[in-house]
Amino acid sequence: MVFDTETEKGKRIWALSQFLVKKNILDHNELHQLNNRIELVYLENDRENALFLVALTLKKPLTIDIWNALYEGFQDAEGAELRITFQEDATFFKDGSTKSSVTLAIIKDYFKSFFGKDKKYRILLEQELTHPNFLSYSNHELKANCQSQELDQWLIEQRQAFIKWMHQAGFTHFGFVSLFNPPAEKQLKVKSMKVSKYDKQFETEVFSTEFVPIHKINQQMDEIKLMGQIFELKDFPGYNNLRNTLNIYVTDFQLGGSLILKWFYKDPKTIEGIKIGTWVKATVKVERDAKTQLLQGIIKEISPIETPAYYRRPDQDKQKRVELVFHTKMSAFDGINSVQEYAQFAKERDWKTIAVTDKDNIHIYPTLYEVAKKYGLKAIYGLECNLIDDHIKIVSNPDKTKLKDATFVIFDIETTGLHGRYDSVIEFAGIKVKHNREVERMQFFLKIDGPLPAAVTEITKITQAQLEDGMEQQAGLEKLRAWLDGCVMVAHNGLSFDLPFLQTQFEKYNIAPLTNPLIDTLALSWALNPGFASHTLSNICAKLKFDFDDERLHRADYDTQALKKVFDYFKEQVELMGITNLEQLDQELNQQCHFELLKRTFTNTGIIYIKSQSGFAKLYELLSIALTDNNATRPLVLTSTLQKFAKSFVITDNPVQGDIFKAALTKPLKELEAAIKRVDFVLIAPPGAYAGYTIREGLKKEAIPNAIKLVVDTAQRLNKLVAVASDAYFIHPWENEYYKAIVCAKGLGGRWHRHFNYKEREQRVPNVFVRTTGEMLNEMSFLGEQLAYELVVENTNKLAKQLTADDLVPVQTKLQPPVIEGSNENLAAKTWSQAKAIYGDPLPKLIEQRIQEELKAIIDNGFGIIYWISHLLVKQSVQDGYFVGPRGSIGSSLVANLIGISEINPLVPHYLCESCQYFEVNEEVDDGYDLMVRDCPKCGAKAAFKGDGHNIPFATFMGFAGDKIPDIDLNFSSEYQAKAHAYVRELFGEQYTFRAGTIATVAEKTAYGYARNYFEIIKQTELATAPEIERFKQKLVGIKRTTGQHPGGIMIFPNHKSVYEFTPCGYPADDTSSDWKTTHFEYDALGNTILKLDILGQDDPTMLKHLGDLTHVNPQNIPRFDKKLTEMFWSVNPLKLKPHYLDEPTGAIGIPEFGTKFVRKILEQTKPKGFGDLIRVSGLSHGKNVWADNAQKILKDQNLSLKDVIACRDDIMLYLIHKGMQAKDAFEIMEKVRKGIALNAKEVQLMQSNGVEQHWINSCLKISYLFPKAHAAAYVLMAWRIAWFKLYHPLSYYACLLSFKLKEHDVSGFKSGVSFVKQKLEELNTLYRIKRIKPKEAELLTSYEVYLEMMARGIKLEQISLTHSHATRFVEHNGMLIAPFITIPGMGEAVANSIIEARNEKPFSSLDDFKKRTKITKKHIEAFTQMQLLDEFREQDNQKKLF
């Protein structure tokens, strides 16, 4: 606005303008805050009148000095005009301040002639202020608006003048963005994102004129230059000598700022410098992808560049601050970064210490220790937790006043806000009651300074006019104080809001505080009505059937009347419980309803830090108690528990959500002092971290720094050290968008994040990134330079020194197994006795030597207990009638085989006579199961000379020195697994046995959904391109959702120690009804310390048990040598199929580990000749980079056999030793290859010097992972036994296969015949080939393959029978299979079992009888009808009608 300096208002403005341009008015370190300004820029399509924009975005706020220098610079150029504009309703104060926004502008107009017309060209440098003493952080833009793009060259010339002025002003880094309007065919409207006025946007790096921000790229652009960071690479190989395509995903971290760049290349060397995390600049042609219709950039030129300055965020201060509050991805739905990212950030800024304070968990401790050690950092171990008093107040200041004699004042207040120190009471209403009779009412309004906020009027319907007729604050507060005195107060949420608000107001006006009792009806409702989902006054009235008008809600007089009805009802209820006075009311309800009160009560967010090594066990116990005994909808740390362990910790409140800061806003000074005295030191945060209070709770912005100062002043007066923390949930300011996405995601149990406003569908996120030292000093400079430095730098370093004085190690590293007396002796005795029972006495030297070596390694290294426990478990399972399946790498151990925990004999191939124990090594085969059964050459016993031994070195299981902790997997029947778990607990005791805990995190598909949901909530779906969603998805993956448990892992802790010396414990998914507790740390963190048993439940052992039961054949007696069975793995000939039924060359369908399409292809190509070859196929199929482009190519190109390629890790060691290499060298090469670690030149040369073939060496160099031979042998043994039943007992085999292995069925489809099943199979195979098949369809595909094979073998499958079907299993009946009830669509086990139970009681007499005695539904009846299963009932009903 133009102002007249002769008017009074004009004079004030002019005086203010002079103040602003004076030099050195502001302190040099004073920083400035800003409102956000959202601008719409319209680019017209008229060429002559086109708008041209040059924008300069500054990286830091402008001080008065800089404004003055710029002003002088413009004047030096050609003269300039200084303007200051105010809003019309600006309010001025004596100190010259204003509550309105102020715009400071330096303006220079030029006139140039174009197209024969004079056009105005304006330079405008402007900044919006919220207060004369505070200048803005954002929107520092130098704008040049002109009428035509012909001005381009002239503007470039002017750029030099701009640069001169900016240098004069002290800026060294800045640039320009040139935006031209698009072609005239379309009118383009450039929209800025709509954001809340409170939503602080991070400042973006300045782009020079050559680069276009990615989110502004559109189809009208042709060739552009951009820059960004690579966050994903996808390489697509070209075929038939065509070029390869590399999709490079880049982002500049602005919302919508991700793009796929396509690079076509032939030579792989050209892409060597293109790596994830690299910043690049590129010249690209903009076009739409023909398939996805997404904008993409076709690369013409690309090169790496340095990370732009803004994104480097260096910490240049000599003395660094220490960040004390940081939340990682392990804070459920509340952290964005991994601890690795955090440590790298710290290391790059030369920080020495990092702290982690995740919420309600310390999962990160083991990783934090390892990462800190890797980066050379010290670690501070913290826990953010919910602190709560043991006693939940229902009554404040309770005494023995009898309920029947008390005078109650039921009251309510309406206020301008939630914060007693910064808001005011505007209405009071109360009803005084004695002996159940109303004796007096009071209601009045109170005046306030300034206008009544519109939001308050909207909620309460109270108007400014009503307040103007009200009482002055002092008088009104004194009046209500006097009226309340001597009475028992009653208020809803009175203990948390009404009472502290009034007490704070009394303190403000020097009025004596209230000391009389107050009953909080909110807490009373929690205790009396545990079934209520909500305890708002309106909801309680609705539940109790009291009239309540929501339109009149939030008026003190109306709320009070409603509350009186509620309180009268509650009083009757407690009197019926025998409660007669206030003290009883408070004490007895706490005792009777303690858990319900804990569930609902508001908690204090505290932070506990470990200060010594002994503190870990104390913290682990404290957290365990919170996660188990005191887990009331969230883990709670009770005051009594904290006091018990307090000496081991350093304790404080969270700087933002803790009671200290809340007290500074809402409570009297006395309560603030009490909160501060309770902690060891005080944490505060920078103002940006408190934005939640201004956004969610309507707190005035100026209250934040005032409250911070109050906390600091009070703490220092009480001699408490004060430090500043970011209270960070992500590292960089631009990661705010990821945090918003997780804030918008609904958490477990349907809970919304505290920063998400569900009603408005809006996230309201504070600026909670990790500040560098300079950033934090700037933001805290309102405290003054010296005090800010003390709190930000000096005190954080003091605390860090205290908290890292010890060399803290959160997890133990030495194996500490449980103790069973005599376990080592029993193991040795069992091993020797069993060996002699099998191989005779004396033992063959080979066997005796192997046992001695193994037992020495096992017992000397403390592993005997592991073997013995496993032996006891398997023995118990076998005694209970359940076969235990083959078990992993343990098969490398002969001791394990002899004591019964492994069926894999690792000796060299050999013969053994079952009659005379004659032992003979055979070197003609490489697997003992490939030795034909013979008559014994010594005693002549018929068919007693049988082969065994799979030639597996012990070193592959327990290391060359035998000191590697054995990982024993026990595959029990899924029907027996729970009993096996219970047996372990019985052996060692509940306090020493826990399920291995796991952490369930956000998976890729879930992260994708969260990202899409975020863009929908902010109504910016046009920005949700595939690469942008990919960027968000990558950041959201891995965030903790909840905890879980390993499917079979049982952790056994030493019975002479406490579990808390190793880990906290909890319940899976915080389910306190769970039968098992879990370890808080995952197995990987405890694997070198605590014994873990993998007691897995699998369908294969279950299937074998039932096959044995059906056929009366013991699976362990199945022949080891069977050429027909071997052939069935790769040929259908042994199955004697009907022709033209099945387009499948192998007989492996349905055989575990061999039935997949991938393995069947390997079988088809390799045609294994025996058991040893089947082990190789298993190794090839389970390894990584072992078959495709490796063994497959070698077999094809060099005409070799399976025994000539590397299939399992043991092959390497055995072959290299065979070639003459030292065993230790062979072992070390095997270890590197099986882990995918590249061999060095020396190791390759060593192999070459020992005559190892080049194709064999090349194969080693390609391998990423190799399967252990013992594991492969175990898989093959299980497959072999099941395959034997398939060949010789087909009906029983298919009954068990369909019952236990196939998850999806189409019995009607089977009945429809071969053509139908073939058609369905072809449809699903097509989906499989194009990778569009869904999980359920994939299951059906396997089922249809089995159906066709059954048909080809002449096996019939009949529909469900009401008289013969089982609930869940396919059963044999009259030479065919009968389907179970569970195959009916939509029928679960409970309903199916109800039919069996009812049928076992007596036959069904009618349809009504069938419905009445089972749990079937209308839909089930419809399904039964369609399958004609109810026809017999209709016949029965018709016969009844005849008679």
From Swiss-Prot:
The keyword Hydrolase applies. Its main location: cytoplasm. GO terms for cellular component: cytoplasm. SMART domains: EXOIII, POLIIIAc. It catalyses: DNA(n) + a 2'-deoxyribonucleoside 5'-triphosphate = DNA(n+1) + diphosphate. One of its GO terms (molecular function) is 3'-5' exonuclease activity. It comes from the Bacteria. Residues 408-567 form the Exonuclease domain. Keywords: Cytoplasm, DNA replication, DNA-directed DNA polymerase, Exonuclease, Hydrolase, Nuclease, Nucleotidyltransferase, Transferase. The keyword Nuclease applies. Its EC number is 2.7.7.7. GO terms for biological process: DNA-templated DNA replication. It is found in: Cytoplasm. Pfam families: DNA_pol3_alpha, DNA_pol3_finger, HHH_6, PHP, RNase_T. HAMAP family: DNApol_PolC. Required for replicative DNA synthesis. This DNA polymerase also exhibits 3' to 5' exonuclease activity. PANTHER family: DNA POLYMERASE III POLC-TYPE, DNA POLYMERASE III SUBUNIT ALPHA. This is DNA polymerase III PolC-type. It comes from Mycoplasma pneumoniae (strain ATCC 29342 / M129 / Subtype 1) (Mycoplasmoides pneumoniae).
